[in-house]
Amino acid sequence: MIKIVVIGTGNLGTQLCSSFDRSDSCKLIGYFNRSNRVIDHLKAPLLENFNIVPACDIVLLCIPDDAIATVSTTLSTTAIVAHTSGSVALSAVSNHERHGVFYLPQSFSASRTAQFDDITLCLEASNSAVMEQLEILGSSLSRKRKHLNSVQRKHLHLAAVYANNFVNHCYLKTQQLLAKEQLDLAILEPLLRETLEKALNMGP
């Protein structure tokens, strides 16, 4: 059974902690966040100091992109260290002999339970042995996994930004226009669904 430590409990980190904590194929050993916030529903303990990592197989860095390299250099561990960013290169954690990337191209919210089954996990690793461990961990979450290098992953992440952020902006503008005349967004829900279905099935 793979033992995991998660550093960072924002939306993604919390969702991963919850999933790993419930899993029969991996075990969450502990988690760390800067605010020392205990996540009540987790069986695993809050770690007081991320510099002192308990014995585990994989440390996942679910932290802001600009903090990855700095945090990686402060970690003292022989475990695999993997970050979860779409735009940061594998080399950001290369100070560890065994390192990788565990990227999920999805938007996560604290108020919605993540459904990982259908998300394609994008993996990158320093060697085949590390990739095997990331594959095992990934299989506990999703049936879809893909190996991408840092350049491919960066382009995928940019495409995800267009697909998510720009579409949400258009939805916001739509809602604002309707609100000016006290019109309900529900009127356009069939149109929104049809537009998305056509884009997915027939192309934009």
Describe these PLM feature segments.
Residues 2, 79, 119:
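Nucleotide donor/acceptor-binding cores
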Residues 4, 27-29, 81, 99, ...:
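Hydrophobic anchor at the start of a short beta-strand
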Residues 16, 35-114:
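Rossmann-like NAD(P)(H) cofactor-binding subdomain of soluble oxidoreductases
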Residues 113-159, 163-200:
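Internal alpha-helical scaffold of NAD(P)-dependent oxidoreductase catalytic cores
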